[in-house]
């Protein structure tokens, strides 16, 4: 989530979108086959969306969460994302920060959070929610324990456990397979501002911090308990690191909203090296890999937070196709 909201929103609404050229970058391994290379940009077919997170499956289906409280889905090779799961009294979705497609378990996980920009849907408890990945039927609701929390992003561990970040309180929660409630996996003052979360192929957990502009490796013992954090040395100065998605091996896709940057992050030991794909987007809180393409969202959140833009209607809400090769 961007550092203009109470948990750290990001605004860069005056910048124009222009993709910088990417020369000589070869990415080994993709989230889907290269058959989606000609798909192009994707339009979200709705108004007042303000997308915040994006995820994808191996066939190229893309899912987008939004401040509006809806999940939008673009089927493989389609360039329009349509409302798929919509907020209702029955499902209790408030606004949506993180979304994550868990193909192994057939589940779409999302973070429901009280609406910072209310008054509609501004009351309630932040929760991790589960929906069937095929039908969109709600399967579970897992409220975050007090104090007031903000579930921000999600990752799946090697054993199928679900991990979710709590930005304002610096906590990571875990939902083990078959469990009916979240348990505290770890907490640390250095995690206040925690946002993106992802596992490497070897099972190592990494997180970023949208407030302190850092990336950490999460240390754990053989019992699977968090024992500490290791701050990584980063090749570039970060600005509001947000969505963090595993690509393959020790490579990740990271979005930074305030500077409109999407990068591949390669982690070797205690060093994280960024290969910049673009730094000319506007307030981009997330990106997801589909084949050789990163699909990046522009939130246009400034139209909710910037007095100069508040009475100006935003343009179309888009996912922009950024080459990863």
Map each language-model feature to its residues.
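Conserved beta-strand positions in repeat-built beta-propeller and related beta-rich domains
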Residues: 47, 62-68, 102, 108-123, ...
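Blade-level signature of beta-propeller repeat domains, shared across WD40, Kelch, NHL, RCC1
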Residues: 293-325
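Short loop/turn segments that connect beta-strands within beta-propeller blades
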Residues: 75-79, 132-136, 176-180, 219-224, ...
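Asp-box/WD-like beta-propeller blade repeats and closely related beta-sheet repeat scaffolds
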Residues: 122-157
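Beta-rich, blade/repeat-based domains predominating
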Residues: 46-59, 89-112, 144-162, 188-205, ...
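A short loop-to-beta-strand structural motif that recurs across blades of beta-propeller domains
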Residues: 70-72, 127-129, 171-173, 214-216, ...
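Beta-propeller domains
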Residues: 65-86
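A short beta-strand motif characteristic of beta-propeller blades
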Residues: 38-44, 80-89, 137-144, 181-188, ...
